């Protein structure tokens, strides 16, 4: 998912590509955005709001459902070193349709003492985002959120930072992202509307820095210039929110060496994916994957030269 040119691997009208951010923050354009996707079976799709609580040691976490992407299998979105048939066969081997790829859009809420921390903000109201409704299911009001941690600035992770009225969606929250990511986001012309809304509310950090008690940023390089994950530690347990280090619970794990259309630096992203999966398989650390099937919580298990995703329903 690419904030600048809005490359999400599906068919989007050219006018929407040029004016996506304006559409997100203009009430009149919200209707245009919805209409643009209405006749396309592939695209961001609405989902039922959901909030799945689970424990990490004594810490309370909640997986929040936001939306779903359905994309054509074009043989290059997730397998630019492959072809349509090769990608399709990999999907069929996991009992999935071979003509499409389905990705969830999930966010993670962490209650840490008096802090209510949201990791990523989803698509936003213009493109079927259900995050606010899912927060409601969790019993959390937008003005209770104290921190919004951003893995990276692609629109399916930052679009929900502003509401349909163009104002801050989380008015009392500090928005935190890496210094490199904020600089890159500000350089993207199509992100200008959102940058204007959140500027003055953003605090940056260097990856590796502690963000909150028990929450540390982790460099997961390659997807965007400042992409990070967040490691949450509670007692003897830990969880890594991987952001967009991986997108498909099948392809990303079975073929971590395949380059991805969405990665800014494909070679670095591939190396990060391979190294991180190897570490996670060895440590058995819990993982939150925003684009894996909701609730996106599970573990990475070694499977020969590849890996398997094992959901761990809280």
Please state what every model-predicted region is.
Residues 34-38:
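Sec/Tat signal peptide C-region and signal peptidase I cleavage site
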Residues 50-138, 229-246:
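Conserved beta-strand hairpin/beta-sheet module of binuclear metal-dependent hydrolase folds
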Residues 100, 104-107, 127-174:
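Active-site metal-binding motif and surrounding structural segment of the metallo-beta-lactamase
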């Amino acid at each position: 998912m690419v904030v600048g040119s809005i490359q999400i691997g599906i068919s989007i009208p050219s006018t929407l590509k040029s004016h996506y951010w304006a559409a997100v923050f203009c009430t009149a354009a919200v209707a245009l955005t919805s209409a643009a996707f209405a006749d396309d079976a592939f695209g961001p799709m609405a989902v039922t709001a959901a909030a799945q609580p689970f424990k990490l040691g004594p810490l309370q976490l909640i997986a929040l459902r936001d939306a779903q992407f359905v994309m054509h299998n074009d043989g290059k979105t997730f397998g630019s070193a492959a072809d349509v048939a090769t990608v399709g066969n990999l999907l069929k081997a996991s009992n999935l349709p071979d003509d499409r790829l389905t990705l969830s859009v999930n966010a993670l809420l962490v209650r840490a003492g008096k802090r209510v921390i949201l990791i990523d903000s989803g698509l936003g109201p213009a493109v079927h985002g259900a995050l606010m409704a899912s927060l409601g299911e969790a019993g959390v009001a937008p003005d209770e959120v104290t921190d919004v941690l951003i893995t990276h600035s692609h629109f399916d992770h930052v679009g929900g930072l502003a509401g349909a009225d163009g104002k801050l969606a989380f008015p009392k929250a500090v928005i935190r992202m890496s210094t490199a990511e904020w600089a890159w986001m500000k350089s993207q012309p199509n992100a200008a509307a959102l940058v204007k809304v959140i500027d003055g509310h953003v605090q940056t950090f260097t990856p590796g820095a502690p963000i909150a008690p028990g929450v540390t940023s982790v460099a997961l390089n390659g997807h965007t210039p400042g992409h990070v994950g967040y490691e949450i530690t509670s007692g003897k347990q830990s969880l890594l929110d991987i952001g967009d280090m991986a997108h498909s619970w099948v392809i990303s794990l079975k073929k971590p060496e395949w380059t991805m259309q969405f990665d800014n630096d494909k070679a670095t992203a591939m190396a990060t994916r391979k190294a991180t999966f190897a570490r996670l398989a060895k440590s058995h650390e819990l993982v939150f994957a925003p684009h894996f099937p909701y609730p996106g919580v599970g573990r990475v298990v070694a499977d020969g030269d590849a890996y398997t995703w094992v959901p761990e329903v809280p």
